[in-house]
Amino acid sequence: MKVNLDYLGRLFTENELTEEERQLAEKLPAMRKEKGKLFCQRCNSTILEEWYLPIGAYYCRECLLMKRVRSDQTLYYFPQEDFPKQDVLKWRGQLTPFQEKVSEGLLQAVDKQKPTLVHAVTGAGKTEMIYQVVAKVINAGGAVCLASPRIDVCLELYKRLQQDFSCGIALLHGESEPYFRTPLVVATTHQLLKFYQAFDLLIVDEVDAFPYVDNPMLYHAVKNSVKENGLRIFLTATSTNELDKKVRLGELKRLNLPRRFHGNPLIIPKPIWLSDFNRYLDKNRLSPKLKSYIEKQRKTAYPLLIFASEIKKGEQLAEILQEQFPNEKIGFVSSVTEDRLEQVQAFRDGELTILISTTILERGVTFPCVDVFVVEANHRLFTKSSLIQIGGRVGRSMDRPTGDLLFFHDGLNASIKKAIKEIQMMNKEAGL
């Protein structure tokens, strides 16, 4: 019996394979003991006493959604093999000198096997900058994965890569089609738990985003899914303390790009005092002050993206706005919106004129010529990182490198102040 090629580089539990397949696979104990504690070998979580089963074994609750791992069982994997050498890059665009410098740095990182952090402002053109290094590894017969914590980011990346690369591309997330083996994979970071020493190059985009940031299980997945001699590259527009520390310790090389691809500065957020938003919302009405800002913006006819702190408030705001602005086509999206992707596309195509969103759209999506309002910008869910990302939706396109970016608040907090300061610093660093 021959090994199913789709199994190469993948990690399996006992119940996912037939008896014959298990005999062909390499084996790992499902759990390991260290300093008197038990750890799951798939997700590296510490096994708790209450996860004990009546049959006399422990199970891991942390990665249970990926099929149960039990201490009395084995994990199985099939070593990855090289792909045929090929020429995969179809993209013939031109990088700016700033992008070119980062692209060159990444090619050198592969040659020197140096883990690298790319800290590039929102709208710098990070995707194009990784093309050369992705192509280099695939052309040599290697396997590459682009991973992100956010499904929306994965879908955007997948669309872009399909246009610009000639090889097959597998897209993996919670509701995607089954995996098929291909030299280029786009996956949510959770999906990396299903791989073992599979990739020559793993690029993790949006490393500052939930659910990846401060998640030891996903850090382990990133480490485990790369070959022993493979390379990890991290992309971010807002670095984290953890990454900055690794740069200081020399564990990561940092490549900076403080300038957007079109050469114009990042838009500086404008804080606007708004103390009566919730008072009016509770009465199912719109704050007159907020209404006047929306009316003024709608006269421009540019699309308007409004960020709300919570799903319930966002839904309510969408209903009120539709009453107040009957000529506008208004949508609302959150992590639980079933037709989110369709609404996002409708907004991009101009079929929706106002879109209200939770932080789900704070990153990885581009809407040409958009203006952005954040209501309750001082809400605890709007961190410095998320406010910088939200701000990065404005002024991304060459057609309109400017735009309105308004932070409505009822008290300036540290997150708003730090976000504004960091955006100003990035512009200064870019010489703008």
Swiss-Prot record:
**Cellular localization per UniProt:** Cytoplasm
Q: What's the superkingdom here?
A: Bacteria
* Residue ranges occupied by any Helicase ATP-binding domain in the UniProt entry: 107-257
Instruction: Name the residues that bind Zn(2+).
Output: 40, 43, 60, 63
Q: Which organism is it from?
A: Streptococcus pneumoniae (strain ATCC BAA-255 / R6)
Outcome of gene disruption: Over 1000-fold decrease in transformation efficiency.
What GO biological process terms are annotated to this protein in UniProt? DNA recombination; DNA replication; DNA replication initiation; double-strand break repair
Write down the SMART domains for this protein, in alphabetical order: DEXDc, HELICc
Q: Which gene encodes it?
A: comFA
Q: What is its main location?
A: cytoplasm
Q: What is this protein called?
A: Competence protein ComFA
Question: Pfam families this protein is in?
Answer: DEAD (PF00270), Helicase_C (PF00271)
Q: What does this protein do?
A: Involved in transformation (genetic competence for DNA uptake). DNA uptake is energy dependent, this protein may provide the driving force for DNA uptake. Does not have helicase activity, translocates on single-stranded (ss)DNA in a 5'-3' direction in an ATP-dependent manner, but does not unwind double-stranded (ds)DNA (tested with 5'- and 3'-overhang dsDNA). ATP hydrolysis causes the release of ssDNA from ComFA. A ssDNA-stimulated ATPase; dsDNA does not stimulate ATPase. ATP hydrolysis causes the release of ssDNA from ComFA. ComFC has no effect on ATPase activity.
Q: Could you tell me the keywords of this UniProt record?
A: ATP-binding, Competence, Cytoplasm, DNA-binding, Hydrolase, Metal-binding, Nucleotide-binding, Zinc
- Enzyme class, spelled out: hydrolase
